[in-house]
Amino acid sequence: MDSVYIETTIVGHIAGRVHPDPLVATRQRVTRDWWRDEARRYEVFISQVVIEECSQGDPSAAAERLEVVKDLDLLEASDDVDELADALISAKAVPASEPRDAFHIAIAAVNGVD
């Protein structure tokens, strides 16, 4: 079975209220359709960072996001993940202002997620 890592934006699109911006609302619809119709075809992973990010903000919205991820497999962070995340930032592949984005990429790559 192929695998996929989902980061917090995906969870927010699944659990969030429909956004008033038509472009964002379309992204939400497409993401929700994928989640409903296709996600079961994959081994879906998250990380502790996703749980931390999902826990932030409005308590009701956070509870909805956490409900989405509660049964997903958790990837473990490691020194290799941290080193790759740092390398992505050093190489300017990910902006230095977005270290969590570098972490999301690194944890999926190091753990061999498709």
Language model regions located:
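Conserved beta-strand termini and adjacent loop/short-helix elements that scaffold enzyme active sites
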Residues: 47-49, 77
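Short acidic/polar alpha-helix capping motifs at helix-coil junctions
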Residues: 52, 67-73
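Short, well-structured N-terminal submotif of metal-dependent ribonuclease cores
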Residues: 1-46, 55-66, 90-95
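Short, catalytically relevant binding-site loops at active-site mouths
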Residues: 50-53, 81-83
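Active-site neighborhoods of divalent-metal-dependent phosphate/nucleic-acid chemistry enzymes
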Residues: 71-114
